[in-house]
Amino acid sequence: HYWTGLATVEATYNNSEKVIKEFQDFYKKANSDPDGEYKNFIITASGNHEHRKQELFKMLDANGIEYFYPFSTGKIVNDAFHYQSNTNQSYTIEQDDIIIPSKQNCSVLAQTLFEPKTFLSDTMTYDITAWSLPYVFGLNAFAIKDEIKIGNPAKVVQQESTISFKEGQYGIIVEWGTVNSLKFLAQIMKQKVI
């Protein structure tokens, strides 16, 4: 590994102008004309569990993927791929929808994570190609081939919930079906709460 590392540094140094140009071209293309069938991905304002959206936004933030509110609402998008029904249908953009555009620095990653249909069938890469994030998080979402004018960045405030037991309480009801439900269950099991 040592010699391979040195050879890589030397090759990069010897081709530094070309390397810099390739990086610049990569980001210019990502922000102006990215590859891929879909131009935007929409996480709908309605029909989604808030905790699931929050978990998605945490993942997007951790990976540097930008997401925005729409510039205007009421636009009807035809031929939008609906993840949950696996069909193309019309969708009207709503005020609190979240748009993940393909045109951004992390274009390739965003498109990979939101691509509705897997193209690789190799079992060696199944774990990284099998699931698009709307499927992973169980979100109502659309993949759009059209350009959508984006508005302000959507930095969603993530709320931490706290639960405190009062004396005499002996139970609590937890909504099941979210990642947070699993985290809660894991924590109480660690604390040996029965």
Positions of predicted regions on the chain:
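Intrinsic-disorder/low-complexity accessory segments
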Residues: 1-194
